[in-house]
Amino acid sequence: MTELQELRRYRRDLHRIPELDFDLPQTIAYIEGVLAPLACEVTHPCPSCVCAFFDAGTGAAHATAIRADMDALPIAEATGAAFSSTHPGKMHACGHDGHMSMALAAATHVDRTIREQPGVIKRNVLFVFQPAEETTGGAKTVCESGVFERYRADCIFGFHVWPDLPAGTLASCSGPLLARSSETHIHIHGMSIHIAKTYGVPVGESHDAALAAAKFLVSERELMDELGADEPCIGKFGLLQAGTVCNAVAGEAHVAGSLRVFTDDMFDRAREGVRRVLDDACAATGCTYDLDFAEGYPPVDNDPELFANVAPALSELQLVDEPLLIAEDFAFYQRHLPGVFFLLGTGVPEGHENPSDSDGCPAYATSALHTDTMLFDEEILLKGLDVYKRLLLLA
């Protein structure tokens, strides 16, 4: 079996069985099945996590860790591919099937190399298959499990497929790459009365939760434009729920969104600004509120020294000019040990057509992540596997 055939088999098998959050029994069983014949120690250091440790046989003091996320999304697949999801309402729409496939292929490569070419891989290797990247940050539970201390891992690498980059493009940078995130929930409390009783009532005495929410959203947008002039910062509220009927003032409103920044200073400024404009909006309408900035993910911040060490081995690496305002729980690993995260392009190269194979899989991704038609061809994963091979050769 060629490496491409191996990658394709893993990816399509996993694509058929998407599972969510920490509830990953079929995915875990599949990964354990691939690892079973390999000369590695398989452990489960925390719930729904699979780790595979390979002893290089060189007396190495430390291990290199490779991470792959396993969870899918609650999306009904509409690709029409022959290997579409068999789990209704669930889909690998963020490429985690590809991430797992690259890691599994890298594991079989490590096993074969240690057996057939002793000493070529000089460091021990730890593969980490983690749950819940899309939800509660499964990486955090992995870090708290002690697995990195147990196997003396002193660096970690990971990938994310990225349709915004041309297929096969490898991109990263030293320092901040992806944003810090915080989900923000606001509950505005007013008083519901029939609209007929509001005639002549000043806005400040209206207790109109919907109006307070509207005022907040307009002012918050202006705030983010102002803060974003200094450094990247975005706060968008995609959820707005207010009232129960059309002919009564909304007594309650719920506004929820996400804040993305790269520095603690900007996070503090944005959080203070949101509270200030919310104070003003509620004071202007006679409402009160509860505000919760949920703990999100830290920024993905590539270790400068580790990046400088690995970059010479990756001659095709393109530098990301500006950090991206997406979030990834790989950041928790980087707070625990030095790490570098890479983006792997899956998009259509300029001037190329995009044919599909006999199973309905396009050569290049044409849909964004988290959409019901997101697909890519496994040939792109060969690039990621090749990068892992080169990283694992470093002493």
Which positions does each model-derived feature cover?
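Acidic/His- and Gly-rich active-site-bordering loop/insert found
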Residues: 1-92, 101, 108-123
